[in-house]
Regions:
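Helix-start/capping segments and mature chain N-termini
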Residues: 1-99, 119, 126-343
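Charged, gly/pro-rich active-site loop segments
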Residues: 99-111
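Extended, Lys/Arg-enriched charged tracts that mediate electrostatic binding to polyanionic substrates
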Residues: 109-121
Length: 343
């Protein structure tokens, strides 16, 4: 394992390159190493950079990747918005399977999972505001510790941002474009200085409707109904967001995707019908929320009780992840079985 700033990366990575005249090279596995790039590479000046998050885990002693096709199709959707060439999904997944099987530094067991980071950037060396004709695509992987038991991740507090804007409909804020994350850092710093863990973003026009929490989608439980902001062109279409919607429906809960005004959440809390709030993302799956502050309104929550909907969803997801429940949704791709078939 390569240790960089407390992140332990595997010994190998995946690489392929693109030129507009010849298209994509074949994806190859090579040693994990620093990347050499020209000072005039367009990614450094005009922002053509995109990344995605994926995760793999132990499933009945087999090595499984969670929704790899969904994640890479989402990655391609981001690339299209940034006028970058889409990647060939099947060859990339096949090469990823090879990497996970041959890299002895990846210690996958019931005590950890594997974080997979595909990323792509423009490499053409020229100055001038135009799209690049050359790109580099890589995948790096690292081991991450698993929760010690089936308990939820620690609850977080949210500060509702009133001045700064994360995204508006029509821009690239709904994608995994690097700049859409960098633009959130100032608000994140200000929220932390006020004693909060993260920022709850409102829409960029009226600053009235709830959108998302930085790199997470958000859900509310009101009168035993689960509600989440509908995708509107400025909210990231998180893979875990869709996963939890499907899980909730399967558990018999009603899920509504709609515009949610922050004032309606404050009112629901005042009326005693807001019981839980949770966020979703690839790395943590579900993170409960214990406090939201909007102007002079403070909402205190207990979203991580054992009987909570948040806990039920987390357990249902973890049971599929660890093989305790059958994967009736066909979400996981079993690496070892595929490797045996191909052999």
């Amino acid at each position: 394992m390569n240790d960089e700033s407390n992140n332990k990366f595997s010994e190998y990575m995946i690489n392929m390159s693109y030129h507009s005249d010849i298209g994509w090279s074949k994806p190859v596995i090579r040693p994990y190493a620093p990347i050499t790039i020209s000072p005039s590479a367009q990614c450094l000046h005009y922002g053509q950079t995109v990344f995605e998050d994926m995760i793999a885990f132990n499933d009945k002693n087999n090595f499984s990747i969670f929704k790899p096709y969904d994640h890479l199709n989402k990655f391609n959707h981001s690339l299209t918005r940034l006028e970058m060439p889409t990647i060939p999904v099947e060859p990339v997944i096949n090469t990823l399977i090879q990497l996970l099987n041959i890299d002895s530094s990846i210690n996958i067991n019931e005590e950890n999972s594997i974080y997979i980071r595909p990323f792509m950037y423009a490499t053409e060396s020229k100055l001038g505001v135009s799209k690049s004709e050359e790109y580099n695509f890589n995948i790096i992987v690292s081991t991450i510790p698993k929760q010690s038991d089936q308990s939820l991740p620690n609850a977080i507090s949210l500060y509702v941002e009133q001045e700064l804007v994360k995204s508006i409909r029509g821009d690239a804020g709904y994608t995994q474009f690097g700049g859409s994350f960098a633009s959130q850092f100032l608000a994140q710093k200000q929220a932390e200085e006020k004693g909060y863990d993260n920022v709850l973003w409102l829409d960029g026009i009226e600053k009235k409707y709830i959108e998302e929490v930085s790199n997470k989608n958000i859900f509310f439980v009101i009168n035993n109904e689960i509600v989440t902001p509908k995708l509107n062109g400025s909210i990231k279409p998180g893979i875990m967001r869709q996963t939890m919607i499907e899980l909730a429906n399967n558990l018999g809960y009603q899920v509504s995707e709609k515009e949610i005004a922050i004032e309606d959440i404050v009112l629901a809390n005042d009326n005693g019908i807001l019981s839980e709030v949770f966020c979703t993302d690839t790395l943590n799956a579900i993170t409960p929320v214990n406090r939201i502050t909007h102007l002079n309104n403070e909402i205190i929550l207990n979203s991580n009780q054992r009987s909570s909907i948040t806990q039920q969803l987390y357990k249902a997801y973890k049971d599929i992840q660890t093989g305790k429940s059958d994967d009736i949704f066909n979400w996981t791709l079993d690496v070892k079985q595929l490797n045996e078939v191909e052999a």
